């Protein structure tokens, strides 16, 4: 599942990098729209990855229903960890792997976002 998340993120970030029209963002208001679109794309990628983990939990009957699986996955992926919903003992290590994956993917997203912002600011300084 971790590999699937990495592939999903890699494809999404690559598509974003190729489609962003950094050169066309000449004014501040245009930059803002580039940042907003990029932020939404990043959020969408994370939601897809959270859903992939949730489907795994549901498919393997580690959680009772889709709502619980998505909720648990979101809380785990973001490392919020409320603890109100837990996996069965044999699945707890998988939950930890999801949390590590979430940390890595969020870090990757932050780095990518920073790189785009830096490029825009540098090119239009």
Task: Please give the residue ranges for each predicted region.
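Transmembrane helix-loop junction
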Residues: 18, 22, 58-59, 115
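Helix-boundary and loop/linker segments of multi-pass membrane transporters
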Residues: 26-32, 84-88
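Interfacial helix-start motif at the membrane-water boundary
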Residues: 32-48
């Amino acid at each position: 599942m971790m590999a699937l998340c990495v592939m999903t993120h890699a494809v999404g970030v690559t598509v974003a990098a190729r489609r962003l029209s950094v050169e066309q963002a000449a004014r501040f208001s245009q930059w803002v729209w580039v940042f907003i679109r990029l932020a939404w794309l990043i959020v969408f990628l994370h939601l897809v990855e959270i859903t992939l983990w949730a489907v795994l939990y549901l498919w393997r009957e580690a959680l009772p229903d889709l709502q619980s699986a998505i909720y648990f996955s979101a809380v785990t992926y973001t490392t919020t960890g409320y603890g109100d919903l837990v996996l069965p003992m044999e699945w707890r290590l998988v939950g930890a792997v999801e949390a590590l994956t979430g940390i890595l993917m969020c870090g990757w997203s932050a780095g990518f976002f920073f790189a785009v912002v830096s490029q825009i600011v540098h090119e239009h300084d």
